[in-house]
A protein has these predicted regions:
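Beta-strand-rich domains and repeat architectures in extracellular enzymes and scaffolds
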Residues: 22-31
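Conserved core positions of repeat-based scaffolds
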Residues: 30-33, 41, 68-71, 79, ...
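A short beta-strand motif characteristic of beta-propeller blades
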Residues: 50-52, 90-94, 128-132, 166-170, ...
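Asparagine/serine/threonine-enriched low-complexity, disordered tracts
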Residues: 30, 58, 68, 99-100, ...
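Low-complexity/repetitive intrinsically disordered segments
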Residues: 1, 223-234
Length: 234
């Protein structure tokens, strides 16, 4: 569930290893976090960023992106605008046919959800970012970038949407990928060799430092990338 807590510890302490206990998600206008009390959001443009729907009930996953925030809770999926309406396609058209949603990931004006039926995406359709490939086989993770999205399935990493910087062109060298993270114009994955990144390198965001030691998690931002390794360095 990528919350940084060992799965065996979570099981021993009565927590669900498939649901994140603590997490932080930063979008263009706001940041949201989950803690023991629920969801907390803050931002730079007043109530639009910090207001959380009162209907949320035990949220276990949250994602911010563009001008929207979405959360998964005991009742399913809830999305709301956080920039005054510039990206309303996500909050106004979220699907109602989800089956046990497990993960939500927001991009720039689009969103994707992983549920028991596979992956559903909606919102802006530019460059095919919301068109999920029929070829996906048993997907286990989805990550939305600004203009593209990627998923992890039985075949490895699959990406779709805008490929102007090569961010959806998955390297053939990837081996047994365990995580994928989509940024603005680049993508990174965690595999047997460590962290592998592709796409735009305009600010060095795909140049992986040689000092990484046994990385366990990677996160792609707009023009940067961060990783967690066994030294605790990000």
């Amino acid at each position: 569930d990528n919350d940084g807590l060992p799965d065996d510890w979570e099981i021993e302490n009565g927590r669900d290893p498939f649901k994140a206990d603590y997490m932080v998600s930063s979008g263009n206008y706001n940041t949201c976090a989950l803690d023991d009390t629920g969801a907390v959001c803050w931002g730079s443009q007043g109530d639009a960023e910090t207001s959380i729907p009162s209907s949320l009930n035990n949220p276990f996953q949250i994602s911010t992106g563009g001008g929207n925030t979405c959360a998964l809770d005991d009742t399913g999926l809830t999305c709301w605008e956080s920039d005054g309406g510039n990206q309303s396609l996500v909050s106004s058209t979220s699907p109602s046919s989800l089956i046990n949603p497990l993960q939500v990931s927001l991009g720039l004006g689009h969103a994707c959800v992983l549920d028991d039926s596979g992956i559903q995406c909606w919102g802006h359709q530019g460059d095919g970012r919301s068109t999920v490939p029929d070829s996906l086989i048993n997907p286990t993770q989805v990550s939305s970038g600004d203009y593209h999205a990627c998923a992890l399935d039985d075949t490895g990493v699959v990406c779709w949407g805008y490929d102007g910087e090569g961010q959806t062109s998955v390297p053939d060298s990837l081996s047994n990928a365990t995580q994928v993270s989509s940024g603005r114009l680049h993508t990174c994955a965690l595999d047997d060799s460590g962290v592998v990144c592709w796409g735009s390198d305009s600010y060095g965001q795909t140049t992986v430092p040689s000092t990484l030691s046994n990385p366990t998690q990677v996160s792609s931002g707009g023009y940067h990338t961060c990783a967690l390794d066994d030294t605790g360095v990000v």
